Amino acid sequence: MLTITSYFGFLLAALTITSALLIGLNKIRLI
C-alpha cells in the first residue's frame, strides 16, 4: 500500500514538473 502511494506521488510530481517545463518553453517561444 505504501509503495503504491509513493509511486503515484512520484508519478504526479514527474507529470507536474514536465507540464511546468513545457509551459515555460512555450511562453519563452511566444515572447
From Swiss-Prot:
Biological processes, Gene Ontology terms: photosynthesis
Keyword annotations from UniProtKB, A to Z: Chloroplast, Electron transport, Membrane, Photosynthesis, Plastid, Thylakoid, Transmembrane, Transmembrane helix, Transport
GO cellular component, as recorded: chloroplast thylakoid membrane; cytochrome b6f complex
Locations listed in the record: Plastid, Chloroplast thylakoid membrane
Bilayer disposition of the protein: Single-pass membrane protein
InterPro entries: Cyt_b6/f_cplx_su6
GO molecular function, one term: electron transporter, transferring electrons within cytochrome b6/f complex of photosystem II activity
Domain of life: Eukaryota
rRNA processing keyword on record: no
Membrane-spanning intervals of the chain: 4-26
Protein task: Component of the cytochrome b6-f complex, which mediates electron transfer between photosystem II (PSII) and photosystem I (PSI), cyclic electron flow around PSI, and state transitions. PetL is important for photoautotrophic growth as well as for electron transfer efficiency and stability of the cytochrome b6-f complex.
Family: Belongs to the PetL family.
Subunit structure as annotated in this protein's UniProt entry: The 4 large subunits of the cytochrome b6-f complex are cytochrome b6, subunit IV (17 kDa polypeptide, PetD), cytochrome f and the Rieske protein, while the 4 small subunits are PetG, PetL, PetM and PetN. The complex functions as a dimer.
Protein name, entry field: Cytochrome b6-f complex subunit 6
Species annotation: Amborella trichopoda
